[in-house]
């Protein structure tokens, strides 16, 4: 199992969904910014979590630190290849205030 910890900001409000058995989850996307050799790079992570109690706080721009299981899937859509980076969150921590234009 691959574990990862990321820190970044939500690019949109978290959304609730139910799996096929009816269990409730939330999902959101986190942008992690990194500067290498003077260039800004952003990596996006799709996060799923079963702890929905903090849902009301997970709004666009909110800073989060997420630790969980990492999965990577290669996707070929309309002749274009790309990679989805997914994290199933075990731990979730909020930090800072929501950034207005995140």
Regions found by a protein language model. Give the residues of each.
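Single-stranded nucleic acid-binding surfaces, predominantly the OB-fold ssDNA-binding core
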Residues: 1-102
């Amino acid at each position: 199992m691959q574990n990862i910890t990321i820190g970044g900001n939500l690019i949109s409000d978290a959304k609730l969904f139910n799996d096929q058995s009816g269990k409730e989850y939330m999902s959101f996307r986190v942008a992690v910014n990194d500067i290498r050799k003077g260039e800004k790079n952003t990596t996006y992570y799709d996060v799923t979590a079963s702890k929905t109690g903090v849902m009301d706080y997970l709004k666009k721009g909110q800073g989060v630190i997420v630790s969980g299981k990492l999965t990577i899937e290669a996707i070929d859509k309309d002749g274009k290849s790309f990679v989805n980076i997914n994290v199933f969150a075990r731990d979730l921590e909020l930090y800072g205030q929501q950034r207005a234009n995140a």
